[in-house]
Structure formats: structure tokens, C-alpha cells
From Swiss-Prot:
Subcellular location: Cytoplasm
One example of a Gene Ontology biological process annotation: keto-3-deoxy-D-manno-octulosonic acid biosynthetic process
Descriptive protein name: 2-dehydro-3-deoxyphosphooctonate aldolase
UniProt keywords, alphabetically: Cytoplasm, Lipopolysaccharide biosynthesis, Transferase
Job description of the protein: Synthesis of KDO 8-P which is required for lipid A maturation and cellular growth.
Gene3D superfamilies: Aldolase class I
Name of the top EC class for this enzyme: transferase
GO-annotated molecular function: 3-deoxy-8-phosphooctulonate synthase activity; identical protein binding
Keyword Transferase found: yes
Subunit organization: Homotrimer.
Cellular compartments per GO CC: cytosol; protein-containing complex
Taxonomic source organism: Escherichia coli (strain K12)
Pathway: Carbohydrate biosynthesis; 3-deoxy-D-manno-octulosonate biosynthesis; 3-deoxy-D-manno-octulosonate from D-ribulose 5-phosphate: step 2/3; Bacterial outer membrane biogenesis; lipopolysaccharide biosynthesis
Source lineage: Bacteria, Pseudomonadati, Pseudomonadota, Gammaproteobacteria, Enterobacterales
Length: 284
């Protein structure tokens, strides 16, 4: 079955092409740390031959606590992104939270991301669609895979079909997430075979029901990522940090930066294997 290709500059993203890595840090903590992390990702992905898009947030507008670090903000964040692009020649993905942010962010980065908690907000979807940028839609934890077609349709009505879908787990009772591996193929089907990627970092969140920040299961990142890659996906979304215990956001779910290369070697091996298989239709 023909898969839709979404192009991010010279990077082609599709379910049957070699996987694209969307990776970086959760939130911009400082200019220097962003440069350090981006440089490491670029070095490793170039060595392994993996297409790469740098990810970071300039504002974490949905933190659990009013006291949690949110990021440097729009103006300073765009300056850091511009420097990263000029220094390393990378493509960049970041999220927007308000309609007014869509165009200023799209003027700087290559992919704008619709956060999971906001994925059904029509005003935001319409503003993002109008930019003409490539869009990454995070599947809300409370939305079934089959409902993602409605969100894609909103973007199409707004004149933008350059949509990538991203799964980051589903609510499993209170304060826990699980990943339905059958959901990936459903998301492909309802979106017209749009590229589907897997955010393994945020799928590992596991909250303290009375805490002010998300916990996580970093020790299981490799096994969950291996399971997702075995489905046959367009890309993998992963956040890393040189010192996860002291990261300002989602450290408990972040891959230690020093483990990036061996981690990606495993992901590439699985992706190469799975996409080398002949298509097998077991529906009839």
C-alpha cells in the first residue's frame, strides 16, 4: 500500500522509508546546553546515517506546577534555534500553544508541533495549518487512534496536508500510560497513510498522583522503543539529557545522552530488518 511522504527540506518522512529521528531535549534550559546536546545528536546520527531533526521546547506551557520551569520564552527560544540551525545545519521541531505563536515559530523552525493536550483546539489547528509548515500532531492520551483522522481532516480543511502523527501513549487508569502497538496501523489507516512516529520518551511518564512533576521509567526506554520500531514506523521521537537526574523537565523519562549511540544502533538495526520484509496481508 502506497505510503504518504512528508518532506522536511531534504528529509523524506514515510512509514516505508528509513526512520527519521526527532530528538533533542525536552525544554531549552540554556543556550550552551542546547548547543552541546544538538552537537552530540548531529555527530551520532551522521555517523549512523540516520536522518535527523532537533527537538526542544521554548515554553512548556502545560507544566503540572505553577512553580515548574517553563523555558526561555518565544523570543529567546527563536534566537537559540536560529543559532543551532546556522551552526549545525539541522532541521528543528518545536511546539506551539497559542494561535498567535504559530506564524512567528514557523518562520524559524521546520516543523511545528501540536501538543497532545491541545490537539482538538480548532483555532490553534487552523492557525498552524495556515503557516504551510510541516505539522507534527501528538495524539492525546485521551483520544483513540481511530479519532486521529478527524484532526488530520481539520488540517486538510485549513489547506495543509503536510501532517505527521505521533503516538505518546494512552491513559491507563489514573497517572499511568501504556502504548497500544495496534494503534499505529489504525492511525496510518485513518490518516490516508500519513507518516506515524513514536514518542517513546513521553510514553514512559508515570505520575506521582500527589506530586508536582511527572515521574518516569527511563530504565525501560530501550525495550519500549524496540517494540515500537518493530511495527514499522516513519520515525522515532526521543529526548536525552547529559544529566537526567537534574534535568529541568521530564528527566525521569529522558535517555542518558551518553547512551544515544548504542540506543540508536539498536533502533536502526530493527528498522532495517522490518522494512526489508515483504508486505504481508493477513486480513484475508
Amino acid at each position: 500500500m502506497k505510503q504518504k511522504v512528508v518532506s522536511i527540506g531534504d528529509i523524506n518522512v514515510a512509514n516505508d522509508l528509513p526512520f527519521v529521528l526527532f530528538g533533542g531535549m525536552n525544554v531549552l534550559e540554556s543556550r550552551d546546553l542546547a548547543m552541546r546536546i544538538c552537537e552530540h545528536y548531529v555527530t551520532v546520527t551522521q555517523k549512523l546515517g540516520i536522518p535527523y531533526v532537533f527537538k526542544a521546547s521554548f515554553d512548556k506551557a502545560n507544566r503540572s506546577s505553577i512553580h515548574s520551569y517553563r523555558g526561555p520564552g518565544l523570543e529567546e527560544g527563536m534566537k537559540i534555534f536560529q543559532e543551532l540551525k546556522q551552526t549545525f545545519g539541522v532541521k528543528i521541531i518545536t511546539d506551539v500553544h497559542e494561535p498567535s505563536q504559530a506564524q512567528p515559530v514557523a518562520d524559524v523552525v521546520d516543523v511545528i508541533q501540536l501538543p497532545a493536550f491541545l490537539a482538538r483546539q480548532t483555532d490553534l489547528v487552523e492557525a498552524m495549518a495556515k503557516t504551510g509548515a510541516v505539522i507534527n500532531v501528538k495524539k492525546p492520551q485521551f483520544v483513540s487512534p481511530g479519532q486521529m483522522g478527524n484532526i488530520v481532516d481539520k488540517f486538510k480543511e485549513g489547506g495543509n496536508e503536510k501532517v505527521i502523527l505521533c503516538d505518546r501513549g494512552a491513559n491507563f487508569g489514573y497517572d499511568n500510560l501504556v502504548v497500544d502497538m495496534l494503534g499505529f496501523s489504525i492511525m496510518k489507516k485513518v490518516s490516508g497513510n500519513s507518516p506515524v512516529i513514536f514518542d517513546v520518551t513521553h510514553a514512559l511518564q508515570c505520575r506521582d498522583p500527589f506530586g508536582a512533576a511527572s515521574g518516569g521509567r527511563r530504565a525501560q526506554v530501550a525495550e519500549l522503543a524496540r517494540a515500537g520500531m518493530a511495527v514499522g514506523l516513519a520515525g522515532l521521537f526521543i529526548e536525552a539529557h547529559p544529566d537526567p537526574e537534574h534535568a529541568k523537565c521530564d528527566g525521569p523519562s529522558a535517555l542518558p545522552l551518553a547512551k544515544l549511540e548504542p540506543f540508536l544502533k539498536q533502533m536502526k538495526a530493527i528498522d532495517d530488518l522490518v522494512k526489508g520484509f515483504e508486505e504481508l496481508d493477513t486480513s484475508k
